[in-house]
């Protein structure tokens, strides 16, 4: 089992301990270590206060000092070091009104979300598991620490995180935990959509996404999310992992809607990908010739095309017409891409200025149309991408 990331962080824990404080690895890294999974981010919990951590280390960043978190920069890596804390009453089902720093590990671990995430580990790899997290991991169960209703009242996002973990880890959800989610799911309406989108993005890529997505539907979670709240998501089927952006595109195509994506507060890149996914799915069924395939591969992002094709079963499960596999498949996509004479308009050996000069014409709507005609002619092999040949072709085929 790879312990390298823990060993890289070990000097931080040892330095804290040398100054008379406790320090432990905690959270997802310990959970993944227990499960034998790859370790990613290392989080550290300590009895030292933020001020004490800043006095111990020369290079720190007070990223969340008021909540007890200091980033310690060590060997060009950032490590989150958080003081043992007890949280006061939560407001709006999403954040504590305040935190109290404590000196007791148990008190810190009991505030955490799920038993599998409430295990601490010292530098000797001894585990501190007060809530039977290892047993739940062995039984592949997600269970809240303490009373489920209280954990979800504190932070409603934990319900979406629970489903995300179920998707990623292929665990079951403890009965009392699931029943609390059924009762309290409406509280996710108090959350920022940005936090929900982060969890949904991870959930949709999980190995057990079908079960988790069905739980999202049965728990009526979509009823309390912007954008999705206006749709009958019970009609949407997800049978395997796909990008969240592709899910949104499938929803749009299936329901033939053009709702604004602004309520989801996505990045410009995400919105662009969603729009391309929609265009790709709408274009695929009509591709029956090699010329159409060439223009299709030229016009759209190949990575997104492949994502749609790999998700063919999901698309079919939502009664959306797919592609003709003899014409469009992963092999023909790659071969067509490799053989394209150019990959975007910047590669074209003429531009608007050259055309206007050659035709002695002023700019106007005609210019965009002619440039597109030239693109099609080059990509489909009707003319070579050379200025003289293109201008000859324009003289013979274009009227303005």
Curated annotation (Swiss-Prot):
Its EC number is 2.7.7.72. Mg(2+) binds at residues 41, 43. The keyword RNA-binding applies. It catalyses: a tRNA precursor + 2 CTP + ATP = a tRNA with a 3' CCA end + 3 diphosphate; a tRNA with a 3' CCA end + 2 CTP + ATP = a tRNA with a 3' CCACCA end + 3 diphosphate. ATP binds at residues 28, 31, 112, 155, 158, 161, 164. Gene3D superfamilies: 1.10.246.80, Beta Polymerase, domain 2, cca-adding enzyme, domain 2. This is CCA-adding enzyme. GO terms for molecular function: ATP binding; CCA tRNA nucleotidyltransferase activity; magnesium ion binding; tRNA binding. Belongs to the tRNA nucleotidyltransferase/poly(A) polymerase family. Bacterial CCA-adding enzyme type 3 subfamily. It comes from Staphylococcus aureus (strain MSSA476). Keywords: ATP-binding, Magnesium, Metal-binding, Nucleotide-binding, Nucleotidyltransferase, RNA repair, RNA-binding, Transferase, tRNA processing. CTP binds at residues 28, 31, 112, 155, 158, 161, 164. Homodimer. GO terms for biological process: RNA repair; tRNA 3'-terminal CCA addition. A single active site specifically recognizes both ATP and CTP and is responsible for their addition. It comes from the Bacteria. It is an enzyme of class 2 (transferase). InterPro entries: Bact_CCA-adding_enz_type3_sf, CCA-adding_enz_C, CCA-adding_enz_firmicutes, NT_sf, PolA_pol_head_dom, PolyA_RNA-bd. Catalyzes the addition and repair of the essential 3'-terminal CCA sequence in tRNAs without using a nucleic acid template. Adds these three nucleotides in the order of C, C, and A to the tRNA nucleotide-73, using CTP and ATP as substrates and producing inorganic pyrophosphate. tRNA 3'-terminal CCA addition is required both for tRNA processing and repair. Also involved in tRNA surveillance by mediating tandem CCA addition to generate a CCACCA at the 3' terminus of unstable tRNAs. While stable tRNAs receive only 3'-terminal CCA, unstable tRNAs are marked with CCACCA and rapidly degraded. Its cofactor is Mg(2+). Pfam families: PolyA_pol, PolyA_pol_RNAbd, tRNA_NucTran2_2.
């Amino acid at each position: 089992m790879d312990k390298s990331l823990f060993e890289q962080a070990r000097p931080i824990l040892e330095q804290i301990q040398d100054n008379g404080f406790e320090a432990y690895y905690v959270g997802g890294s310990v959970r993944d270590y227990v499960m034998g999974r790859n370790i990613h981010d290392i989080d550290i919990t300590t009895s030292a206060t933020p001020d004490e951590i800043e006095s111990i280390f020369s290079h720190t960043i007070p990223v969340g000092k008021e909540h007890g978190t200091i980033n310690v920069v060590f060997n060009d890596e950032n490590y989150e070091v958080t003081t043992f804390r007890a949280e006061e009453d939560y407001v709006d089902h999403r954040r504590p009104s305040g935190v109290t720093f404590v000196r007791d590990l148990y008190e810190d671990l009991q505030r955490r979300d799920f038993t599998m995430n409430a295990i601490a580990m010292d530098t000797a790899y001894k585990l501190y598991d007060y809530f039977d997290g290892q047993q739940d991991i062995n039984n592949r169960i997600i269970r809240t620490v303490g009373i489920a209703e209280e954990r979800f009242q504190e932070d409603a996002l934990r319900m979406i995180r629970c489903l995300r973990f179920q998707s990623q880890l292929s665990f079951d959800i403890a009965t009392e935990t699931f029943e609390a989610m059924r009762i309290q799911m409406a509280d996710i309406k108090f959350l920022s959509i940005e936090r929900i989108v982060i969890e949904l993005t991870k959930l949709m890529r999980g190995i057990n996404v079908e079960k988790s997505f069905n739980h999202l539907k049965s728990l009526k979670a979509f009823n309390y999310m912007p954008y999705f709240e206006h749709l009958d998501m019970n009609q949407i089927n997800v049978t395997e992992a796909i990008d969240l952006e592709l899910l949104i595109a499938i929803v749009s195509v299936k329901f033939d809607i053009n709702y604004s994506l602004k309520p989801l507060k996505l990045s410009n890149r995400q919105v662009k990908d969603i729009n391309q996914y929609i265009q790709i799915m709408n274009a695929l069924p009509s591709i029956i010739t090699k010329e159409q395939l060439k223009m299709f591969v030229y016009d759209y992002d190949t990575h997104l095309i492949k994502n749609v094709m790999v998700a063919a079963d999901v698309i079919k499960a939502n009664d959306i017409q797919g592609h003709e596999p003899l014409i469009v498949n992963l092999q023909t996509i790659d071969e067509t891409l490799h053989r394209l004479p150019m990959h975007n308009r910047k590669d074209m050996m003429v531009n608007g200025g050259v055309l206007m000069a050659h035709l002695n014409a002023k700019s106007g709507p005609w210019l965009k149309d002619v440039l597109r005609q030239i693109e099609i002619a080059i990509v489909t092999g009707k003319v070579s991408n050379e200025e003289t040949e293109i201008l000859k072709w324009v003289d013979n085929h274009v009227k303005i």
